[in-house]
Amino acid sequence: MNTPSARIAVVIPCFRVREQVLDVIAAIGPEVGWIFAVDDACPEHSGRWIEEHCRDPRVKVLRHEVNQGVGGAVMTGYRAALETASEVIVKIEGDGQMDPAL
């Protein structure tokens, strides 16, 4: 986590992904140093769910007060990732449709 070799950040837009997002996060390997989960005003409160049930110290939840769509959520995550020492930023869907193993 956040080691010199872990220079990859992952952005996960979160909207109605509460049932799958913890499994997605758990499948992200140690080569990733930062995980930004963006709760896009999710009616299921995905961000709060992640904070309450995920113990991965790499995870930071970001929140939108108003839904901005997947593009807005991705941009919020990208901006946060750019503030880290990451060299690569990867967007992964929170519903499990993409293999999070890098």
State what each model feature region is.
Residues 1-102:
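Structured catalytic core of nucleotide-sugar glycosyltransferases
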